[in-house]
Amino acid sequence: MSNIKLIVGLANPGAEYAQTRHNAGAWYVDLLARSHNQSLKEESKFFGYTARINICGHDVRLLVPTTFMNLSGKSVVALASFYRIQPDEILVAHDELDLPPGVAKMKLGGSHGGHNGLKDIQNKFGNNPNFYRLRIGIGHPGDKNKVVGFVLGKPPASEQQLIDDAIDEARRCTDILMKQDMDKAINRLHSFKASV
């Protein structure tokens, strides 16, 4: 069984960013909330939108920061400190350039890989990288100079469908994670690849 008590979906705030690739983590958290008949509500003391759900008998808080991506740690640490949640009890969902659309992977710890949201969370936890990550594939533009425009762009419908399918499978694997264990959730998620 997992000890996850907080699931975070990284995003940039505002309607202009809502449908951009960089907000894939928030899409996952929003789906989790909706699948448990909850809606995210703004809580200014946590600098984000929050909800509380029950996954397979486990009390879990959801968070989508309203800070910009590179300040995500401020929001995550505010909520984690208030509820005494440790880094290894947190799952952070984020967009991943190194995975194609239609693929998602989970892991504990590791490098931030240049992702500004992960980097800030790690820094705010005193350079502690030992939180879980859900990496949602968005693909790569093929040129590092085009990355910013790519992550802040909206995916075409075919790519969006692949990303949505991977997020839906990640949601199903979240139940496995909470009720059984990380290895089973990882094995199932890592064997999944959406196709058009």
UniProtKB/Swiss-Prot annotation:
Active site: residue positions: 22 (proton acceptor)
Native source species: Photorhabdus laumondii subsp. laumondii (strain DSM 15139 / CIP 105565 / TT01) (Photorhabdus luminescens subsp. laumondii)
Gene3D superfamilies hit by this protein: Peptidyl-tRNA hydrolase
Cross-referenced InterPro entries: Pept_tRNA_hydro, Pept_tRNA_hydro_CS, Pept_tRNA_hydro_sf
Enzyme Commission code: 3.1.1.29
Signal sequence region: none
Residues flagged as site, Discriminates between blocked and unblocked aminoacyl-tRNA: 12
One Pfam entry name: Pept_tRNA_hydro
Catalytic activity, as annotated: an N-acyl-L-alpha-aminoacyl-tRNA + H2O = an N-acyl-L-amino acid + a tRNA + H(+)
This protein's name: Peptidyl-tRNA hydrolase
Cellular component GO terms held in the UniProt record: cytoplasm
Any Gene Ontology biological process: rescue of stalled ribosome
Entry similarity comment: Belongs to the PTH family.
Location within or outside the cell: Cytoplasm
Record-annotated site: Stabilizes the basic form of H active site to accept a proton: 95
